[in-house]
Curated annotation (Swiss-Prot):
Residues 98-134 are annotated as: C-terminal basic extension. Its main location: secreted. Residues 1-23 form the signal peptide. Monomer. Binds to CCR7. Interacts with PDPN; relocalizes PDPN to the basolateral membrane. Interacts with TNFAIP6 (via Link domain). Interacts with GPR174. Highly expressed in high endothelial venules of lymph nodes, spleen and appendix. Intermediate levels found in small intestine, thyroid gland and trachea. Low level expression in thymus, bone marrow, liver, and pancreas. Also found in tonsil, fetal heart and fetal spleen. This is C-C motif chemokine 21. Residues 88-134 are annotated as: Disordered. Residues 123-134 have a biased composition (Basic and acidic residues). Disulfide bonds join 31-57, 32-75, 103-122. Keywords: Chemotaxis, Cytokine, Disulfide bond, Inflammatory response, Secreted, Signal. One of its GO terms (biological process) is release of sequestered calcium ion into cytosol.
Length: 134
């Protein structure tokens, strides 16, 4: 009885304790298989990432992430001059910051600070007032 329990425990340890090499990254990696034939305009791209053959992909590539998240990544040859220039442009350009609450500028708000028609329920920030002398 004790031997069968020890054997079962050993099998469990071996089954779950040995790291797996195939697919150990959590899933299949998306790889570019060919490069875009057209130059990609900077206005349609928000960022990029690098694809390396050493990480399991067949070709080196730069994957440009489009501004519209519903669109597919755009693959480009890292040796092309326009690709290097676009990467430098994206490195210099700070990523756009969204407003803290996603609010639009209040339209129709009165001077008292009440919400207007276009405020969409967003809070206005109060200006800190310095106390006046005693």
């Amino acid at each position: 009885m004790a031997q069968s329990l020890a054997l079962s425990l050993l099998i469990l340890v071996l089954a779950f304790g040995i790291p797996r090499t195939q697919g150990s990254d959590g899933g299949a990696q998306d790889c570019c298989l060919k490069y875009s034939q057209r130059k990609i305009p900077a206005k349609v791209v928000r960022s990029y990432r690098k694809q390396e053959p050493s990480l399991g992909c067949s070709i080196p590539a730069i994957l440009f992430l489009p501004r519209k998240r519903s669109q597919a990544e755009l693959c480009a040859d890292p040796k092309e001059l326009w690709v290097q220039q676009l990467m430098q442009h994206l490195d210099k350009t700070p990523s756009p910051q969204k407003p803290a609450q996603g609010c639009r500028k209040d339209r129709g708000a009165s001077k008292t600070g009440k919400k207007g028609k276009g405020s969409k329920g967003c809070k206005r920030t109060e200006r800190s007032q310095t106390p006046k002398g005693p």
